[in-house]
Design a protein with these regions (language model features):
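Hydrophobic/aromatic beta-strand patches that form the interior of the parallel beta-sheet core
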Residues: 7, 58, 78, 107, ...
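Conserved catalytic cysteine-centered active-site region
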Residues: 37, 41-53, 82-134
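Conserved "HGTGT" condensation-loop signature of ketosynthase/thiolase-family condensing enzymes
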Residues: 1-75, 99
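Short glycine-rich or small-residue beta-strand-to-loop segments that form or flank ligand, phosphate
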Residues: 75-82
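Conserved beta-strand-centric core segments of catalytic alpha/beta enzyme folds
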Residues: 1-21, 120-142
Length: 142
């Protein structure tokens, strides 16, 4: 088994925040009811950006923070989401196009809450079999 590690992370959060008060009013329940079941108090939301734009901003943050990350070395892009704005082409292909990455496998994983873990598992399998050397895994939802 190979020694595989996550070498860098990036993030992007839209500026609009929605707390449980909004959802409690909509669903006629208490804020505490939501928090006890989800552990979430506040969510970030964007009216003006689609899922593809959120993913690209996250990757730009990753590259900006980590000089050792060169998009041209990425040979696989895996995007995990439950809120894609289009099925084809997948978000991974739009990322590949945006960063002009050549010779790159693209895959979108639509698997609900476990999607990001599934995407990491896929990346690990490709690394262990030498089918990928620098996969990029992106988790993005709106």
């Amino acid at each position: 088994m190979k020694n595989i590690e996550i070498i860098a992370t990036g993030k992007y959060l839209p500026t609009t925040k929605i707390d449980n008060t909004y959802f409690a009013k909509q669903l006629n329940i208490t804020e505490d009811f939501i928090y006890k079941r989800t552990g979430i108090q506040t969510r970030h939301y964007s009216k003006d950006e689609n899922i593809e734009q959120l993913a690209i901003k996250c990757i730009e943050n990753l590259i900006e923070k980590n000089s050792q990350i060169n998009p041209q070395n990425i040979d696989m892009i895996i995007v995990a989401t439950t809120s894609t704005n289009m099925l084809m082409p997948g978000i991974s292909y739009k990322i590949q196009e945006h960063f002009n990455i050549e010779n790159c496998m693209c895959l979108d994983v639509l698997a609900g809450c476990a999607g990001f873990v599934n995407a990491l598992d896929i990346a690990q399998c490709y690394l262990e079999t030498d089918k990928a050397k620098m996969p990029l895994v992106v988790g993005v939802d709106l």
